[in-house]
Amino acid sequence: NLLTSGGVPNPYNGDQTSRQQWESVSRGLARLDGKIPYIIAQGNHDVGYVAAENRYSSMPEYVYPERNSCFANSLVATGCNYQGINTMENAAFEFHNKTWGDILVIAFKFAPRDEALDWARQLIESEKFRNHKVIVLTHSFLGTSGERIKQESYKLTPRNWAQEVWTN
């Protein structure tokens, strides 16, 4: 399984637009399709047109449940994005491992909204997942000092920073 914490397109790495970078990433992910599930938590450069000034994302055009046949055995839920559409921008995956037992991985979009946190909480507390170990995959969680991030300067709203994700 592959887990990545975002930064898929990045305006500081060359001369490609966000769309061109997503297309490049999509070609790379195609090599994994049908082989392993991959879980993407979008970062600050994955949302908005530049860097998290709004909640728009190109991800649903490139990463969706039918794309990778491995999602059929691991993707257990998708949450609504800011438009009210279920996408893999907020997604949950289940894995079973002899050593670790039952695992639920929840991937959040950068600075998740209250609705995404509520959706995840309901999953975690459900009868089906109540006894699972839970991994939360998100972007921009710890600062350089190792402390949870309490505030960032992005204009994105509504949103929750790391400390709010942790306490909710």
Annotate each PLM feature.
Residues 1, 34-43, 108, 135-139, ...:
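Active-site neighborhood of phospho(di)ester-bond hydrolases with catalytic His/Asp-centered motifs
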Residues 1-8:
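Active-site metal-binding motif and surrounding structural segment of the metallo-beta-lactamase
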Residues 4, 46-47, 142-143:
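Active-site micro-motifs of SAM-dependent methyltransferase domains
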Residues 4, 37-39, 147-149:
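Predominantly extracellular/lumenal beta-strand repeat domains
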Residues 11-18, 117, 127-168:
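Active-site-proximal segments of metal-dependent phosphoesterases and phosphodiesterases across multiple
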Residues 75, 121, 150-152:
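Generic preference for flexible, low-structure residues
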